[in-house]
Every structure is written in C-alpha cells, then in structure tokens.
C-alpha cells in the first residue's frame, strides 16, 4: 500500500515476534513511512534501479546455490510457477528480459533452469546461458501460463497441489507461503476452469 503498512500487517509482524525486516523494492514500491511503522526492529531495504537489479541483488543475498532459475521479469506467472522448483533445488530465481541482465558469474552454478517459453525468456538469453553452461540448461514451459505451471509440476512429481488463479498474481503469490516445507506443486488455473 502506498500509504504504508495496514494496521493488520503491523499487528501480525509483532505477533510473529519478528526482529529483522527486509523491505524488497525501492521507495516507489514500499514507502519510507513503513520503516517508521516498525520501531525497534532491524529494518533494511534491498532495491535496485529496476526489478531486474533488485532481483540480482536478491540472488546475491540468497548466497551459494548449485542451481539458478531464470524467468521473465515482465510477467508474474512464470516466476510463480518457478517457485516450487526453486524451493526444491534451494535456488534463487532471477528475473531477466535481456542479455545485459544476466549475471557475469554463471559458471558458479552447476545447472540453470529457464521457466517459460521463448516469448518469455528469449533464445538469445538461453544461448548465452548455454555458452557458459553447455548442456546443463533446462527449459520448462507450456503453451500458456497454466500449462507452464503444469509442466513444472510434471518435473517435480509432487502429490500435493495448490491451485491459484493464474490471471491475478495476488492469490498465487500469497499461496507461495504454503510451499514453506516444499513437496507441493503450485498450479495456476483459469478463472472458470481447471
């Protein structure tokens, strides 16, 4: 909310006993007033000039991983579909949309996963990743956002499914909290059908 945290959110943070808060995004995303709503807590902000730089900083913050997952930063659905895979692999998700957004240190990752079709993460990006990783690059995609999430689920082979509206990011983003222990698919569905 541009006006700051809602009262319920502040109350929940206190009830959870949180002592450290990380704000993700710049002042246009999360206003400075949020910090004043959280007195006595360690609050820090991770942000960049755009969503891609913020994503890159979060990947760095994530720490070491043997894997990395790439998704299109212009569309939320593929990033949401990638979340159960990233959880299983204990890997960060990096938002990309052009070659200049790729990390320079691709070689540190054992393998890379691209979630989404060639219209989401282009062949130029895939080829650049392959030039470093060789055959350790895997693309998972479907004809649309719902089938992409289904293809990720096919790879994971989990028995438990979380269904969320694939047309609106809010429900699916909230559902990511249910992935805390892994072992669940996040399936995006159309509003009027499964």
Q: Positions of the model-derived regions?
A:
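Extracellular glycan-binding segments that recognize GlcNAc-based cell-wall polysaccharides
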Residues: 1-194
């Amino acid at each position: 909310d541009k006006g700051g945290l809602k009262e319920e959110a502040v109350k929940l943070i206190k009830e959870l006993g949180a002592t450290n808060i990380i704000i993700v995004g710049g002042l246009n995303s999360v206003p400075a007033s949020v910090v004043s709503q959280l007195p006595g807590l360690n609050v820090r902000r991770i942000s960049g000039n755009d969503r891609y730089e913020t994503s890159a900083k979060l990947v760095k913050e994530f720490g070491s991983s043997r894997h990395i997952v790439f998704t299109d930063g212009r569309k939320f659905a593929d990033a949401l579909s990638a979340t159960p895979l990233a959880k299983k692999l204990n890997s960060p998700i990096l938002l990309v949309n052009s070659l200049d957004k790729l990390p320079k240190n691709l070689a540190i990752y054992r393998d890379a996963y691209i979630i989404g079709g060639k219209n989401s993460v282009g062949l130029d990006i895939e080829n650049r990743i392959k030039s470093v990783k060789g055959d350790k690059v895997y693309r998972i995609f479907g004809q649309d956002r719902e089938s992409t999430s289904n293809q990720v689920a096919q790879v994971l082979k989990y028995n438990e499914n979380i269904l969320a509206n694939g047309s609106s990011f809010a429900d699916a983003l909230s559902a990511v909290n249910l992935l805390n222990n892994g072992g669940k698919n996040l399936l995006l569905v159309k509003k009027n059908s499964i």
